[in-house]
């Protein structure tokens, strides 16, 4: 995805900044280097470039392998649910992020110049931005689906097509909002003679309004929607639990109490909510520093110092980290992947048939793919 850098900052770096795979980055990120001796800066950045390449390769491998495991786990399930569908969509998005965003960044760092034709430049940039939007909007869709599962459980059971509709809208908006990228970016020769897939702005001042709009469409507005939705979900769960405590304390009919218990929010749904919240918290932790840094930088709030550059390099690694973390979160919540088989066989040998059946039923209910 396009990096928000001016040509002047590119000359200072002599390479593409870390998160070349995102449309929101830092403007004139190393202007402080004008005060440094050129030789000192060159040796400093060369060593840093090697570390960044190692980091990118690690993130790429973890992202592809981790999400491949998730896709294999969800696809081999005979009993699929709406939560399985959303987990699959998230894994698909993260996998393409690794292939199109992280891998192209690695290739670009090795080649230096952009070797492909102008059309490839525009298409690659477009797909990178599509994936950025999609990764956010899939989370919004997941939040809406969990809201309906908790607040309107009866309608939720009747609306099996809702998940596909939500994902369809998420991807449609992603492709639509990314169209300006096809116009903004193109292959160009910079004043230092290097050929790059770069923004074709008539003036660098265009970056500030453009990147501000992108930041709100990609991050701030979706985050506000997600926060409101999960606020309502938590409120609904709390109210139902309070009502449950009151009814149970006053309940004298055993059959009536059992019937009421069956109408409560299931443990499976609660675990799905926990899984969704952890995924969203990971998204917030990885992307908040990045977008906040970009907004402050676009409005010239940050000083031109070495510390600013060091911070920017670390911050620009966080978004790529998000696609590698998601499958690890799924692994933690899914006992089907992380449970040691030998331990289970040992436990099975000491259990009665009834105990094994009850444990198997609880494992099915606890897996996010069956929620």
Curated annotation (Swiss-Prot):
Cell membrane as a keyword of this entry, yes or no, is: yes
Query: Any idea which UniProt keywords this protein has?
Result: Cell membrane, Disulfide bond, G-protein coupled receptor, Glycoprotein, Membrane, Receptor, Transducer, Transmembrane, Transmembrane helix
Q: Cellular location of this protein?
A: Cell membrane
User: What triggers production of this protein?
Assistant: Increased expression in lung after ovalbumin induction in a mouse model of ovalbumin-induced lung inflammation.
Which segments cross the bilayer? 53-73, 83-103, 124-144, 165-185, 213-233, 276-296, 313-333
Query: Any ranges marked Cytoplasmic in the topology annotation, and which?
Result: 74-82, 145-164, 234-275, 334-371
Sugar attachment sites: 4, 13
Instruction: Report the GO terms under cellular component.
Output: plasma membrane
Q: List the disulfide bonds.
A: 121-197
What function does the entry list? G-protein coupled receptor for neuropeptide S (NPS). Promotes mobilization of intracellular Ca(2+) stores. Inhibits cell growth in response to NPS binding. Involved in pathogenesis of asthma and other IgE-mediated diseases.
| Protein family (similarity comment) | Belongs to the G-protein coupled receptor 1 family. Vasopressin/oxytocin receptor subfamily.
Q: Provide the protein name.
A: Neuropeptide S receptor
Q: Which organism is it from?
A: Mus musculus (Mouse)
